[in-house]
């Protein structure tokens, strides 16, 4: 969005989908997560402030769930302090059973570990054990499988032997992946069946890892002081809470899941155990809640359809980058979002107050509006998340509004139906001058380059890529051209600046904000690991930015005047008109005085000539 720098300044914001593609995803991911985490914490604060929390005092007490979520424990609101029922360092054992029922444990023991201690000793980190077993017809036909984790400790002082039970599903049901496209030029065989896609059809996926943790926490909680975010995980009995068994799926990505069908003959699972602290556990579950909320709002990508979610990309970024890069990325992403907002705000302000199209390229604005429409259709055809789709649709409406400010739109309505019969786009009077002449000239030269590129990329895509339909081919070919060559569509504005020898008509405040974001994008293009060609694609739009800077240098703007389209600019314009009017009146007065003087001289010369003639006659 920002790589075009000042070029985009006069013509609106670049689509968000293109921003995510050009930045390799990292800037878009972090910016998106920052917004959603802010929304999440604001909403949490509002609910806790005005609606109360789940652990407020009430006459009926607080209901807490235990680890397996099957029973509840009611704790009176005036209960004593809650302490851990397991002392530090006590030995325990852990067993994992597999069962097709979430209620019956059965006798299928697959993992067992003795003499574990409830503390931070290194001996509590158990190496991964791989278990492989044959699949059954039940599992191959969307059957379920559960892991029953049973943790037991010996009797301690006056406390009896304790046993914890956690049930964890190993099968998850997700929508069936969408079928891939086809080569539209290949002839379809008559014997080949027609594949129909049902978005409501679910298939089973196998979780190949089971990471077990026992949360080490010896905090003594005063009454009603357990954080509401974790209160549902506690199992409390007689003023004591039991340790929490945590099945960690935070690092389980969508791509790790294995589909289970008739062709799968064996399944394997890796089981490991280690201790985990309360802070780390809370951090993981809070972050996972934020990511889940983002996906529920439609901002998680197409993970259910087979693609990687934004949450998975964010987690992968945490593991693949150094901490200092993550910290720098977070700070710069916040600045990036602020500059983006300021650029958008000032861009809207400029076009709202702009009264003249002199020096501005209407063709470039029209092209940008068409590009935004193409990208919106492409995102709609690919069933992109609602968040990205709404952002792109809003951007298209903004560009159409700017087109309405640049031109006069005349709508003729039908007499029988409330539908438009004809829509006319009429250029404004200020534009019908040298600006339009230069704009048409630049568009003619640009079309010589643009049309062959569109045709060439479309033919290449038709031969070598797969598409769902002919409509998808047309839209994807157009959007590929937009993503690849959109930067050259700003050349008409450069051409107009060159011909008019002026850049004062451009919104330079918007230009500066987007220029800062351009530097940020270029910085991350070299910090973040990505292919060389992708880095060059991030730098190519800087050509337009550099040309704009050069034009700004050779065509300086009077700093005492505002050319931003604001109220100050209108006052300056009115003052200029007043000064010009006064100068014109002065010149007219001077002309009148000169004419009167000439008339007087003519009259004097005429009278003197008459006197001379009279004297001559007398002589």
From Swiss-Prot:
Name the residue ranges with Low complexity bias.
Answer: 9-21
Any single GO CC term annotated in Swiss-Prot or TrEMBL for this entry: membrane
Q: Where are the transmembrane segments?
A: 26-46, 324-344, 360-380, 384-404, 445-465, 474-496
Q: What keywords tag this UniProt record?
A: Membrane, Transmembrane, Transmembrane helix
Q: Bias regions of kind Basic and acidic residues — which residues?
A: 574-590
Family matches, as Pfam families: CLPTM1
Q: Which region ranges are annotated with the description Disordered? A: 1-21, 566-619
Give compartment(s): Membrane
Instruction: State the annotated membrane topology for this chain.
Output: Multi-pass membrane protein
Q: Which PANTHER family match?
A: CLEFT LIP AND PALATE ASSOCIATED TRANSMEMBRANE PROTEIN-RELATED (PTHR21347), LIPID SCRAMBLASE CLPTM1L (PTHR21347:SF0)
- Please report the name of this protein according to its UniProt entry: CLPTM1-like membrane protein cnrB
Organism lineage string? Eukaryota, Amoebozoa, Evosea, Eumycetozoa, Dictyostelia
């Amino acid at each position: 969005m920002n790589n075009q720098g000042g070029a985009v300044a006069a013509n609106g914001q670049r689509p968000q989908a293109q921003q995510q593609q050009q930045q390799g995803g990292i800037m878009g991911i972090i910016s998106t997560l920052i917004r959603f985490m802010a929304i999440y914490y604001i909403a949490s604060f509002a609910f806790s402030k005005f609606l109360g929390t789940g652990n407020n005092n009430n006459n009926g007490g607080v209901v807490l769930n235990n680890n397996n979520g099957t029973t509840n424990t009611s704790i009176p609101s005036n209960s004593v302090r809650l302490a851990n029922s397991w002392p530090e360092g006590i030995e325990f054992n852990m067993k994992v059973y597999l069962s097709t029922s979430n209620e019956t444990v059965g006798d299928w023991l697959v993992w067992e570990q003795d003499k574990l201690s409830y503390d931070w000793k290194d001996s509590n980190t158990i190496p991964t054990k791989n278990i492989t077993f044959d699949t059954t017809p039940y599992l191959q036909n969307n059957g379920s499988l559960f892991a029953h984790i049973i943790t037991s400790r010996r009797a301690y002082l006056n406390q009896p032997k304790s046993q914890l039970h956690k049930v964890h599903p190993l099968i998850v049901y997700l929508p069936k992946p969408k079928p891939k496209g086809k080569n539209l030029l290949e002839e379809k065989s008559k014997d080949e069946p027609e594949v129909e896609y049902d978005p409501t059809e679910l298939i089973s996926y196998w979780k190949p890892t089971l990471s077990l943790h026992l949360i080490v926490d010896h905090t003594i909680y005063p009454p009603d002081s357990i954080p509401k975010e974790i209160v549902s995980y506690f199992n409390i009995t007689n003023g004591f809470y039991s340790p929490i068994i945590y099945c960690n799926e935070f690092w389980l990505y969508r791509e790790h899941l294995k589909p289970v069908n008739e062709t799968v003959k064996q399944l394997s699972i890796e089981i490991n155990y280690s201790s985990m602290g309360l802070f780390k556990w809370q951090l993981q579950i809070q972050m996972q809640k934020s990511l889940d909320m983002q996906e529920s709002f439609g901002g998680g990508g197409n993970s259910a359809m087979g693609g990687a979610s934004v949450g998975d990309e964010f987690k992968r970024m945490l593991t693949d980058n150094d901490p200092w890069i993550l910290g720098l990325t977070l700070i710069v992403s916040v600045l990036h979002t602020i500059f983006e907002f300021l650029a958008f705000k000032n861009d809207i302000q400029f076009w709202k107050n702009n009264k003249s199209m002199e020096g501005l390229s209407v063709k470039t604005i029209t092209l940008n509006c068409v590009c935004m429409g193409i990208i919106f259709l492409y995102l709609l055809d690919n069933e992109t998340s609602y968040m990205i789709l709404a952002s792109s649709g809003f951007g298209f409406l903004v560009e159409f509004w700017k087109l309405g400010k640049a031109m006069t739109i005349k709508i003729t309505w039908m007499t029988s139906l409330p539908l438009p019969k004809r829509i006319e786009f009429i250029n404004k009077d200020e534009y019908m001058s040298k600006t339009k002449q230069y704009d048409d000239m630049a568009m003619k030269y640009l079309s010589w380059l643009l049309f062959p590129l569109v045709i060439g990329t479309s033919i290449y895509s038709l031969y070598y890529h797969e598409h769902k339909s002919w409509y998808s081919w047309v839209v994807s070919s157009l959007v590929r051209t937009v993503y690849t060559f959109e930067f050259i569509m700003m050349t008409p504005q450069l051409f107009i600046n060159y011909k008019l020898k002026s850049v004062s008509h451009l919104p330079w405040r918007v230009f500066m904000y987007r220029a800062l974001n351009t530097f940020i994008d270029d910085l991350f293009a070299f910090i973040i690991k990505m292919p060389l060609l992708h880095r060059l694609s991030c730098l190519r739009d800087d050509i337009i930015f550099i040309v704009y800077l050069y034009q700004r240098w050779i065509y300086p703007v009077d700093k005492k005047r505002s050319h931003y389209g604001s109220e100050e600019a209108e006052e300056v314009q009115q003052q200029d008109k007043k000064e010009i009017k006064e100068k014109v009146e002065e010149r007219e007065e001077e002309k009148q005085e000169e004419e009167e003087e000439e008339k007087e001289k003519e009259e004097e010369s005429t009278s003197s000539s008459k006197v001379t003639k009279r004297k001559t006659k007398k002589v």
